Amino acid sequence: MHELSIAMSIIEMAEEEADNRGVQIDAVHLKLGTLSGVARDALLSCFEMACENTRLQGSRLVIEEVPVVIFCASCQAQHPLHSMQLFCCPECGTPSSEIVQGKELEVVALEIKECAPNLV
């Protein structure tokens, strides 16, 4: 299960950024492509488990799923791919292996916890 090692890498990166900025992380926002080879539910479970006893304990992993989009050389256009069975243009049927998006595994944002102001 490589999702655990991915979750641990995400946590390590977020902790390093939190340390550098002196903040607490409330959520990690991630783009996850359909063709990334990562199981969304497994990654969510692994993230929750791996956060225990870290600075990110209690934080959330927010995943934006990125669909597959191909470029068709015949149409000279990008098209979302609705079936993973055939990598063909949905408009003209031309086979295409040029994937424009859908392989992402990218941390795009860290949501910082709001701290209550110190009352004097």
Question: What function would you assign to each model-found segment?
Answer:
Residues 1-62:
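Long, charged N-terminal interaction/targeting segments
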Residues 21, 29, 105-120:
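Long, charge-rich boundary regions
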Residues 31-35, 64-68, 108-110:
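Short loop/turn motifs enriched for small/polar and acidic residues
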Residues 62-70, 80-82:
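Immediate flanking context of iron-sulfur cluster ligation sites
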Residues 70, 87, 105:
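Cys/His-enriched microdomains
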Residues 82-85, 99-103:
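Short Cys/His-rich "knuckle" micro-motifs
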